[in-house]
């Protein structure tokens, strides 16, 4: 089970949120919300706090700085895919989450390696989102564009 939360639930329905997190496998959360939930500025500590609430993994979205996957045994940070023209960042985090969850649903691989691959997919999907307003770019997106950007991103990350 995957959950995405925000400050509204943290400040307004904290007990219900914590009860929900106990039943969740993966929490996807923005960095500011992770800090609010944990009362920790350090995101590594915030991630560990989240794991103590029940999830086996936390995905902390960090906006233009990418995202971090936190598990009991590891941390994995993925940068945001570099985009030359950012038109509107609204919804990029949701597009990241959609790419992440979509990859896991399609592949069925929730191992640490599978989660890392899902992080890469999420970053790529978010990069398309910021290229236009609303969901326009995503609506006209073709699979070969995704695959091409994934290949480019993997090459950037290799050294």
Regions found by a protein language model. Name each.
Residues 1-49, 56, 66:
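Conserved beta-alpha-beta core of the PfkB/ribokinase-like small-molecule kinase fold
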Residues 43-159:
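Conserved phosphate-binding/catalytic region of the ribokinase-like
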């Amino acid at each position: 089970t995957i959950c995405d939360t925000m400050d509204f639930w943290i400040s307004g329905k904290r007990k219900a949120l914590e009860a929900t997190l106990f039943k969740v496998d993966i929490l996807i959360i923005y960095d500011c919300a992770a800090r609010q939930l944990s009362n920790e500025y350090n995101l590594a500590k915030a991630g560990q706090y989240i794991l103590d609430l029940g999830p086996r993994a936390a995905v902390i979205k960090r906006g233009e700085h990418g995202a971090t996957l936190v598990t009991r045994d590891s941390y994995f940070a993925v940068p945001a895919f570099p985009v030359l023209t950012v038109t509107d960042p609204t919804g990029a985090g949701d597009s990241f989450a959609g790419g992440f969850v979509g990859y896991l649903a399609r592949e069925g691989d929730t191992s640490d390696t599978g989660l890392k691959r899902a992080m890469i997919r999420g970053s790529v999907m978010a990069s398309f989102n910021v290229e236009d307003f609303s969901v326009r770019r995503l609506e006209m997106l073709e699979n070969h564009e995704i695959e091409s950007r994934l290949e480019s991103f993997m090459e950037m990350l290799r050294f």
